[in-house]
Amino acid sequence: MSALSLAHGQTNLPDPIKVPSGHKLVLESVGVGEITYECRGKANAPGQTEWFFVGPKATLNARDGQMLGSYFGPPATWQAKDGSTITGTQLAVAPSSSGNLPYQLVKANPAQGKGAMTGVSYIQRVATRGGVAPSLACTAANKGQREVVSYQADYLFWATN
């Protein structure tokens, strides 16, 4: 993919999720989908429960609505329409506005397959809307219950200059 004009200025983003210098934006997408949560026992806190992030399922679209690929997990996987895929490791998160997923910076693993994901080294999640754990109480009475919440986020894919 050719380099795109930078629609999201790095200067307006929190420092922890800024992409290191020496990288260019190669793909910009709007992820629209759902995140599944499950009411589970809280780790290292006997008798307590919490909503646990199970995984995402989203379509990645261009600004004009053209479908570019998908995002799913676990593990967190971005797949282009051409079949190329990447997974990654979260490096940092930063707060977004109330009721929205945090911003995120992910270090990409080498792509599987040749295509749009080849050469991607970082993924940013910004402009988040929704996606946080359900407001429904998670208690011993509904342990094991799954809830699905809608979300939207911009996913920005970066490669070395």
Explain the meaning of each model-derived region.
Residues 5-9:
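Boundary at the C-terminal end of the N-terminal hydrophobic targeting segment
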Residues 10-36, 43-161:
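Primary mode marks residue(s) on the alpha4-beta5-alpha5 output face of response regulator receiver
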